[in-house]
Amino acid sequence: MMTTPHTRAAIAALMAGVFTCVPGAWAQPAPAAAAAQALPASMPYVMPSTQVWDMASASGEMYRIFVSAPVGGEPPRGGYPVLYVLDGNAYFASFAQARWVQEYLPIGKSIVVGVGYPGDKAWDVRRMNDYTAQLRDPPPPETRAYAQHKSGARQEFLEFMTGKLRAEIALRYPVNPERQSLFGHSFGGLFALYALYERPQAFQSIIAASPSMEWNAQSILDDERAFSARMTAGKVGSTSRLLLIAGDRDTAGDPESVRLLADRLQRLSGWGLRARLLRYPNETHGSVPAQSVNDVLRFAFEQR
């Protein structure tokens, strides 16, 4: 087909218009990007009725303290009972949420204190130092991989828990000094047992969930034997109540070792120790804490 000068001019003008428009079209945001631009600004979630601060121990070790406490209203007579939760970065939120939604019940008229470490990790390697006895030299084969990390500060950590931290909580909140409880899981559960054996009057209730009793060739058994000897000799007096928790699908050997521990400690009931075992079918080492939350709160905060 032959084109005339007028036709060629019209086509040129049309093409110029097309290419003039294309860059503008390319500049338009993709549908997904446009949708993203339209989203409202987000913000971090802050759990109601909670406070967080960092504080140092006497030796300068830094800890992050998480607290869930009732807001408003009168505290119970004698003050609020307190549950200290080890590995607070990992477990505080679960316990705090359960306490908060039950605040209208007696179990919720209480304070949960999570003890953790600055940072956003669920677990900090420093827990191994704070919760354990000094690793033997040479280390047992099953704990040799841990030899690169510090261990053995459990006594100093217990002093921090029962001294400076407890005093700080009492300054900030009306607490009942006669209703103080401790929860720990895994290494934290091992520390909870140590707290019972070393300072049996420091906490009125202790919960040891899936305690890592195999640590350091079961050196915690030495502490248990010394504690039992003091108990049967009448040298302890009043002592904590103890709740042991294990999952039936916990790591190899754990459920059985915890059951045997419960049997041994229950024999001390004649000397004042009240110990019981709670087992969860189908729960593993990692799932026990979530399953245990309400059982722990009831054990810690029930009226006795």
Q: Across the structure, where does each feature detected by a protein language model lie?
A:
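Bacterial N-terminal signal peptides
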Residues: 12-22
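Non-catalytic cap/lid and distal C-terminal segments of serine-dependent acyl enzymes
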Residues: 28-304
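Bacterial N-terminal signal peptides that target proteins for export
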Residues: 2-12
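Sec/Tat signal peptide C-region and signal peptidase I cleavage site
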Residues: 23-27
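N-terminal leader/targeting segments
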Residues: 3-4, 17, 29
